[in-house]
Amino acid sequence: MRIKPDDNWRWYYDEEHDRMMLDLANGMLFRSRFSRKMLTPDAFCPTGFCVDDAALYFSFEEKCRDFELTKEQRAELVLNALVAIRYLKPQMPKSWHFVAHGEMWTPGTGDAASVWLSDTAEQVNLLVVEPGENAALCLLAQPGVVIAGRTMQLGDAIKIMNDRLKPQVHCHSFSLEQAV
C-alpha cells in the first residue's frame, strides 16, 4: 500500500499510547516511536500536516529507496523521520558505541549513513534526519540492532558524531535478464 500526503493529515499526541501520532485521514493512524519525554512542547498541540512536512516526506521517501527495507518499513522510517525533525527534543551524541574514522564526513538531510559498532564491528545503517556541524541526529534504518545491551528498532533515534559516520555504499545486484 502506498501512502501519499494530503491536506487532511493531522499530527497529535495520544495520551493513551504515549506516542506522537499522525492521522492519515483515511481511517489509518501512524504511531511514532517517540514518547512524551522525547518530544518538544509543540507536539502537544494538534496541528495539520503542512507543505514543509509534505516536501520533507517526498525527500525522505526518495532517499530511503536504497535501503534494504520493505515498502511498509520504508514508510514507517519516513514518517518517524518527519516526527523526529519536527518534534524531537535535542539529544546528546552517543558516539562512544561506534568506531571513529580519520576523516570527518558532513552528511546532509536524508543521507544514508553507516557506522560500525566498537565492540562487534557490525555495520549499522542509519538515515540522517538532522545534520549538524559536528554531529547528526539519525534514525535506525534497519529492522533492529543491539547496542551495548539495548535493542534499537527501526526508526529509533540516536545522535552520532560525524567522525563516526560514513556514507552508505549501496550495492545493487543485477541478474543477466536485467542486463539484456
UniProtKB/Swiss-Prot annotation:
Its main location: cytoplasm. Transmembrane segments: none annotated. Signal peptide: none annotated. This is Cell division protein ZapC. Pfam families: ZapC_C (PF07126), ZapC_N (PF21083). Belongs to the ZapC family. One of its GO terms (biological process) is FtsZ-dependent cytokinesis. It is found in: Cytoplasm. The keyword Coiled coil does not apply. One of its GO terms (cellular component) is cytoplasm. Keywords: Cell cycle, Cell division, Cytoplasm, Septation. It comes from Salmonella typhimurium (strain LT2 / SGSC1412 / ATCC 700720). Contributes to the efficiency of the cell division process by stabilizing the polymeric form of the cell division protein FtsZ. Acts by promoting interactions between FtsZ protofilaments and suppressing the GTPase activity of FtsZ. It comes from the Bacteria. Interacts directly with FtsZ.
